[in-house]
Amino acid sequence: MRQTILMKAMFATALLLMLGMTRTALYGQSSEERAKKAPAKTKVISTTQSGMPIVWRDPGTVETLDFVGGLGGREQAPKPPFTFIEEDRTGSNPKIKVMDANGVKWSVKWGSEVNAEVFASRIAWAAGYFVEPSYFVASGKIDGVKKLGRAKKYVNSDGNFTDARFEMNEKGITKLDDKQSWQWDRNSLVGTREFNGLKITMMLVSNFDNKDVRDLGRGSNTAIFQYPVGDTVESRYVVTDWGGSMGKWGGVFSREKWDCKGYAQQTPEFIKGVKGGFVVWGWSGQHTKDGAGGISGSDMKWLLQYIGRINDDQIRVGLKASGATQEESQCFSKALRDLILQMQIL
């Protein structure tokens, strides 16, 4: 009997060692090793040389977050007077670079994306995702404006403007964008609940514009922001443009930005069901499969711990702070709550 017990103990020890080796083989690989095994046709983005990649951080008590000030808070809102630096001719919308009274540099945007970008980024921020501090400025004046191209339509000769989005240029950050930006289907965070939660958040606000490093000709909407943290560097995966939100997802000729009627009309199509353990979404965008695929019910349940705690008052004040009219605020508030309810029911 003593020999039998000894043999069982030896077998159990061997089994544990085998399991440990298997786990190491599955999960202990570096991102470089995983990259070598990936198909050669698609470049694998790795940030291990620059620092640990991260896409999400616990937002804390979601119910108390200020949707007026957002990430930057009310105290960091752009302060006039604004001084012209130069016109930014990149992207599809008119933009100007300015400096405010506090010496902070801002990217000022006009056009169809202004309201959507401010509000959608508030939702992403409340869910724990990294965004850039942005504010809606109803009117103002930029001193020293000259030689405007696209922005001439939105800025008078005396520098006065209306309905602009101000996005802060944070100091001390290295931004890896364009050719160094990340790809939705090829990065070290694919398959994690945090990364899948980002995809759900994109669909929740109906952001069809999930362009990435594959779309350099049209401009990537992803980037890696390197933040110094002590003696190390934290590499944050960021969606840099939320302007294609709060409207209709779909093809080139059907999608819209900041269109509550279209946003509400697509509410019944938000979630189609569940197949093979994965949620089937109605959403479509620039990269539909990469944006909607591989999301489980447990991923959605995890995200609801944060998204589900955003209250109606926060939504309303956030919409108002984004420049929404009272009618738009009522419409968007109801539609967004209905979408969150669909997730909770499923």
Residue ranges and their predicted role:
Residues 95, 117, 121, 198-201, ...:
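Extracytoplasmic/secreted envelope proteins and their assembly/folding machinery
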Residues 114-117, 122, 177-256:
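Conserved kinase catalytic-core segment
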Residues 2-5, 18-84, 100, 309-346:
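Regulatory N- and C-terminal appendages and interdomain linkers associated
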